[in-house]
Regions:
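Conserved small/polar residues in nucleotide/adenosyl-binding loops
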Residues: 1-5
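Anionic group-transfer/hydrolysis microenvironments
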Residues: 73-75, 101, 130, 209
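ATPase catalytic-site recognition across NTP-hydrolyzing enzymes
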Residues: 11-75
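Charge-patterned, long linear interaction tracts outside catalytic cores
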Residues: 199-224
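Mg2+-dependent endonuclease catalytic cores in nucleic-acid-processing enzymes, primarily RNase H-like
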Residues: 84, 91-200, 219-220
Length: 224
């Protein structure tokens, strides 16, 4: 309740960190501020990711990106293997999708070879920890692969962190991630009401993205 009516609450009750966070969000993303702190509905109500900008990301932009995060969601068939490479603009709390590799029926050797041929062994890759052998395979193949840290509520925690960020995506560069990010919606009951929780389907690139930022999320918390 305080978050949605915080201007009516004495500042000393909320604390300066809360006020600073609200004002920071107001400055960098007014629409997110209005939704989260003022209670103004400004989305379609069903989309999980509301702060998405679809546009061309140029080679010149990418050349200047130096805070790179990479993640892997293991898969075979019918579930896809998904690798994503993104950039995080900390000051503006914005994620940019740079590249992806989302495929079926590829061995660890084949996907590792793709990563190395693209030159993407320049940064660590945070992987789904559910397959420790695959993580070890990547390490043996010369990649800096690390297992994501998981715990109770880690999926919800990570998803909320991503939801608060703006996501910039170029359909030409990352068509699979584009489709997932822009169509991923909450489930609804028979009466059309939204069901809490995140559907575990059509979300392989999304899971890869969540793993990529695992260290940031766990280190700095949901409101980082």
């Amino acid at each position: 309740m305080y978050k949605r009516q915080y201007l009516d609450v004495p500042k000393e009750w909320l604390g300066q960190p809360f006020i600073d966070e609200a004002e920071h969000l107001k400055e960098i993303r007014p629409e997110a501020y209005e939704h989260e702190y003022m209670g103004i509905a400004n989305g379609n109500g069903g989309a999980v990711f509301e702060y998405v900008e679809v546009r061309e990301i140029t080679d010149e932009e990418i050349a200047q990106m130096d805070r790179i995060y990479q993640g892997v969601d293991w898969g075979w068939y019918p579930d896809k293997y998904a690798f994503t490479r993104t950039y995080y603009d900390v000051a503006r709390e914005t994620i940019y999708f740079i590249d992806e590799h989302c495929v079926n029926k590829r061995s660890n050797e084949q996907t590792a070879d793709w990563i190395k041929k693209k030159g993407y062994n320049d940064y660590a890759i945070i992987c789904d920890s559910a397959e420790p052998k695959s993580v070890e395979d990547y390490r043996n193949l010369g990649l800096v692969a690390q297992a994501a840290v998981k715990g109770p509520g880690s999926v919800e925690y990570g998803m909320k962190w991503l939801q608060r960020r703006k996501i910039v995506i170029d359909p030409r560069r990352t068509p699979y991630a584009y489709k997932e990010i822009t169509t991923y919606e909450y489930d609804r009951d028979k009466d059309g009401n939204i069901i809490s929780g995140y559907p575990d389907r059509d979300n392989h690139a999304i899971d890869s993205l969540r793993y990529a930022y695992n260290r940031v999320i766990m280190r700095r918390g949901e409101n980082a």
